[in-house]
């Protein structure tokens, strides 16, 4: 008889790293073939700009999630409860209640952490007590070995599994753009301060002052940085001729944006893994990113791209400059990045790794 697994996770919308991984898990024939699975969506927001808003509506949605969980624990009787536990903000407490409910039923829990904030929670005695309860005798899946310090206070390494994310192959064929006089830099993520939007704009200002031939396109949904705020900053830095905001793009439009780029820039200030870096590598783009979260497990410094300290526009600009002036280096790093993606970060590689972990947990 197949073992039963209850997956409590995030599903799009909105589109972000955790919700996309949740969708990959739910849709995977490899992961679900050997188990009897049920799914509950943890999300209470339908778009990024809803996050932190409409509290009364979200209370109703959360009550529904709790009732769904209670019903599945009673009726489905899972052998394992998988929870994509949110570590950040107030969402931590709502997810923690779900996890403790499963523990109350005597269920074996495994937490898959897609974001970070456990270190900050060690400063609050209530959070420390809650974390001790949550993580006691519980297994954890992390995206990178660089993330273990986040939870080492609560979880021995013997109970930690490492499973890097993966992404599906490109769905459409694309034609690489013809060479132009300006090197095309792409930023693709939500417009958030935490994603380093302003850092990249400052770096672009430095590049412009050096009279380097480049153009930077920003693609992504509005968040704590609106289109108006973005354009105001662009004007302040006198970058109107060098920077363009192209809005949100999905599917073929997003792939076209990648195919038209020469360099991918992701100066994120707060990241767990960064699926978008994998997408850039899939398109044979050299990546300039930050020494943040599990990114050093993805980008090989000096081989598939460059990594700099976060919030350092000067250092970021210097690495971009190296790629702008050296087309041979761009192509070489891009090819190495594509090779690294194919060997380590395909969706199938993620599915196989995740399935191995599940089988270990439910055997």
Report each predicted region and the residues it spans.
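Conserved donor-binding/catalytic core segment of Leloir-type glycosyltransferases
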Residues: 6-8, 176-204, 216-222
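Glycosyltransferase donor-sugar binding loop
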Residues: 41-45, 188, 215-231, 247
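Donor nucleotide-sugar binding/catalytic pocket of nucleotide-sugar-dependent glycosyltransferases
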Residues: 131-173
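Nucleotide-activated donor-binding/catalytic signature segment of Leloir-type glycosyltransferases, i.e.
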Residues: 229-249
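Aromatic "clamp/platform" in nucleotide-sugar-dependent glycosyltransferases that forms part
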Residues: 269
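Short hydrophobic beta-strand element within catalytic cores of glycosyltransferases
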Residues: 286-289
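Conserved acidic donor-binding segment of nucleotide-sugar-dependent glycosyltransferases
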Residues: 301-302, 306-313, 322-328
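A short, well-ordered alpha-helix in the C-terminal region of glycosyltransferases
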Residues: 315, 322, 329-344, 350
């Amino acid at each position: 008889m197949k073992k039963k697994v209850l997956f409590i996770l995030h599903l799009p919308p909105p589109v972000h790293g955790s919700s996309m991984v949740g969708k990959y898990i739910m849709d995977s024939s490899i992961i679900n073939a050997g188990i009897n699975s049920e799914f509950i969506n943890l999300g209470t927001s339908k778009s990024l700009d809803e996050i932190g808003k409409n509290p009364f509506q979200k209370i109703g949605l959360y009550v529904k999630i709790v009732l769904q969980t209670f019903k599945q624990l009673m009726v489905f009787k899972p052998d394992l409860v998988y929870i994509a536990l949110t570590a950040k903000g107030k969402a931590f407490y709502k997810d923690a209640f779900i996890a403790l409910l499963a523990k109350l039923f005597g269920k074996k829990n495994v937490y898959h952490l897609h974001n970070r904030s456990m270190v900050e929670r060690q400063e609050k005695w209530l959070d420390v007590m809650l974390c001790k309860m949550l993580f006691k005798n519980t297994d954890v899946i992390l995206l990178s070995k660089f993330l273990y310090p986040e939870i080492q206070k609560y979880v021995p390494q013997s109970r930690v599994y490492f499973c890097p994310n993966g992404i599906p192959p490109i769905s459409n064929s694309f034609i690489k753009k013809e060479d132009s006089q300006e090197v095309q830099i792409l930023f693709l993520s939500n417009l958030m301060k935490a994603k380093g939007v302003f850092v990249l704009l400052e770096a672009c200002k430095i590049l412009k002052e050096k009279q380097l031939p480049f153009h930077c396109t920003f693609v992504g949904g509005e968040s704590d940085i609106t289109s108006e705020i973005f354009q105001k900053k662009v004007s302040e830095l006198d970058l109107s001729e060098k920077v363009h905001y192209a809005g949100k793009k999905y599917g073929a439009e997003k792939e076209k944006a990648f195919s038209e780029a020469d360099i991918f820039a992701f100066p994120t200030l707060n990241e767990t893994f960064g699926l978008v870096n994998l997408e850039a590598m899939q398109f044979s783009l050299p990546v300039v990113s930050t020494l943040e979260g599990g990114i050093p497990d993805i980008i090989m410094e000096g081989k598939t791209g460059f990594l700099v300290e976060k919030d350092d526009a000067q250092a970021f600009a210097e690495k971009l400059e190296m790629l702008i002036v050296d087309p041979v280096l761009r192509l070489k790093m891009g090819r190495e990045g594509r090779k690294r993606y194919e060997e380590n970060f395909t969706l199938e590689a993620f599915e196989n790794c995740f399935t191995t972990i599940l089988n270990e947990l439910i055997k």
